[in-house]
């Protein structure tokens, strides 16, 4: 247990740049990526066509087109996803792209309404 406490203490003393470098090194060492949970969710949704006969309970909210009011759409994407400005801008400019995946029908409809209110074209899949 003393080893774990020392590791926690060592990690707590890292600067932000050192922590980012550690993260990259661990991703390379373990062969994983910070984006892995999104990929897993997408793979899980694609692996379930047999359940398509039942009513869908999880939806992917896909930004089809940002429309003319990109700034408003970027603001909404940031509010919905918690992404930073650059990440939200890249998502909006790279449309069509999923904004949120595997969400309940009610939440998906709410997100769709928010984005459409900002001027975007949105699809639920």
From Swiss-Prot:
Record keywords, A-Z: Ribonucleoprotein, Ribosomal protein
A Pfam family the protein falls into: Ribosomal_L12
One GO location term (cellular component): cytosolic large ribosomal subunit
Record-level GO BP terms: translation
Entry keyword annotation includes Transit peptide: no
Superkingdom of origin: Bacteria
GO molecular function: mRNA binding; structural constituent of ribosome
NCBIfam families to which the protein is assigned, alphabetical: L12 (TIGR00855)
Assigned protein family: Belongs to the bacterial ribosomal protein bL12 family.
HAMAP family from the UniProt entry: Ribosomal_bL12 (MF_00368)
Subunit structure as annotated in this protein's UniProt entry: Homodimer. Part of the ribosomal stalk of the 50S ribosomal subunit. Forms a multimeric L10(L12)X complex, where L10 forms an elongated spine to which 2 to 4 L12 dimers bind in a sequential fashion. Binds GTP-bound translation factors.
Known function: Forms part of the ribosomal stalk which helps the ribosome interact with GTP-bound translation factors. Is thus essential for accurate translation.
Descriptive protein name: Large ribosomal subunit protein bL12
Source species of the chain: Chelativorans sp. (strain BNC1)
